[in-house]
Regions:
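P-loop NTPase nucleotide-binding core
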Residues: 1-72
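Conserved beta-strand scaffold positions in the cores of enzyme catalytic domains, especially
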Residues: 2-5, 124, 146-148, 156
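Conserved nucleotide-binding/hydrolysis micro-motifs of P-loop NTPases
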Residues: 8-12, 80-81, 129-136, 218-219, ...
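Substrate-engagement module of ASCE P-loop NTPases
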Residues: 59-68, 94-122
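Conserved P-loop NTPase "ATPase switch" module shared by AAA+ and STAND
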Residues: 68-98
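Structural recognition of the conserved hydrophobic beta-strand(s) that form the central parallel beta-sheet
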Residues: 75-77, 106-107, 121-129
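Amphipathic alpha-helical segments of the small helical/lid subdomains adjacent to P-loop NTPase cores
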Residues: 133-139, 147-216
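Extended alpha-helical interface modules used as scaffolds for assembling large macromolecular complexes
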Residues: 144-145, 204-386
Length: 386
């Protein structure tokens, strides 16, 4: 028997009472659905309390235990979705209230812990973005196992090269009508979607979500390459960077390290599967925080980098936004029209230096290097050329 919760559907509120009400409105139905789907086992069972997700779960689990029914599997998708929203909205006091004491959320997880201990729950599997909320929720929850950094688990987080190549050949055969395009398309997807390493010595993986996004659009276009190389839903909200770094100068310094130096140095002992909110916002911990947000990946035991051209382009967008660099199309389109007519690169280079680099103050040019030129020029080109 399975109970599936999806916390990403949680409606936000600015008060504790409002959040608790929204939590109950969302999470009463999953246990009701489990009971109805297994009515042959639950017989004439009825809930004595409604409108309280924790009490309804406890009642159903008590019945399972008393009648010796099959154990329950609990799945919680995006367990930290709404608590992360509290953090990005600077509602730290409300976050603390939700994740400490006898809050509705801690009480809910205590009910799950009790169910596991008493034998009515076989296991509870949670997915989320950060281990921060789990650390705050499960202090003393000593039966939890964190899979995040286990090698066998990280290998499942994307496609390896063999799997991606097989996937590409299948899509080309079915939708591309020309198997000679393999090398061309392979180079394209490696440059844009490969390069993710979740452990220092791991093999690189393709991001399965955006690779599948590309293939889906490739199929819909009957073998055409989509203009948009990345699903917009995967662009991490720039508010995370603002919230993580607290002040603008910290954000700029961090972005400078990635788009100018091309790397962030990290301490390997910091790469852990569980840490609290205070650690997450610590200045020296930024590289690992970015790793968990999906913004960087591991190059080796000492350095984190942006994994591919897609990530570099997204980061340059962040950089431009935080530095108030205009992307007014009227300043760029004439040069790209000229390029399309005559196929000469010089107008694009001149346009880049005048309209993009020309927006920076003179002192910035002391820091600008080849890596920055390459990343920023590619980002500008990708706006107008597919």
């Amino acid at each position: 028997m399975i109970i599936r919760y999806d916390f990403s559907k949680m409606v936000m509120d600015s008060t504790m009472n409002g959040l608790e009400q929204n939590f109950n409105d969302l999470n009463c139905s999953p246990v009701e659905i489990m009971v109805e789907h297994n009515r042959d086992l639950f017989g004439d069972f009825k809930f004595s309390v409604r409108g309280n997700a924790t009490k309804m779960l406890e009642e159903a689990l008590a019945y399972v235990r008393m009648r010796g029914l099959p154990k329950v599997y609990i799945l919680i998708d995006e367990y930290d979705n709404f608590t992360n929203q509290l953090l990005t909205a600077y509602k730290d006091p409300l976050y603390e209230s939700v994740t400490t004491g006898e809050s509705f959320l801690r009480t809910f997880f205590k009910a799950i812990k009790a169910g596991i201990g008493e034998g009515s729950i076989r296991t509870c599997f949670c997915t989320g973005v950060l281990p921060v909320t789990m650390d705050d929720l499960t202090s003393g929850y000593n039966i939890a196992e964190i899979l995040t950094l286990k090698p066998d688990f990280t290998e499942m987080l994307g496609f390896n090269h063999e799997e991606a190549a097989e996937y590409l050949r299948y899509v080309i055969r079915k939708y591309g009508n020309n198997e000679d395009r393999f090398d061309e398309l392979w180079t394209l997807i490696v440059n844009n979607y490969d390069g993710y390493r979740f452990l220092p010595n791991a093999h690189p993986l393709f991001n399965s979500t955006i690779l599948t996004y590309f293939f889906k659009n490739f199929a819909e276009l009957s073998g055409g390459v989509p203009d948009e190389m990345v699903d917009e839903n995967l662009r991490t909200d720039v508010n995370w960077i603002r919230r993580l770094t607290i002040i603008l100068e910290n954000a700029k310094e961090m972005l400078d390290a990635l788009v100018i130096d091309g790397e962030l140095i990290y301490s390997q002992p910091d790469l852990r599967s569980k840490f609290n909110k205070q650690k997450f916002f610590d200045l020296d911990f930024y590289p690992v925080s970015l790793y968990y947000l999906g913004m960087t990946t591991l190059k080796d035991n000492y350095v984190m980098v942006l994994p591919n051209l897609t990530a570099q382009s997204i980061y340059m967008n962040y950089y431009n936004e935080l530095n108030q660099i205009s992307d007014d199309a009227r300043c760029f389109v004439p040069a790209y029209r000229l390029f399309m007519d005559h196929r000469k690169l010089k107008p694009l280079v001149e346009n880049y230096f005048k309209e993009y680099l020309g927006q920076f103050p003179a002192q910035v040019f002391d820091k600008i290097n080849e890596n920055f030129i390459r990343c920023s020029f590619y980002e500008v080109l990708s706006r107008y050329l597919s």
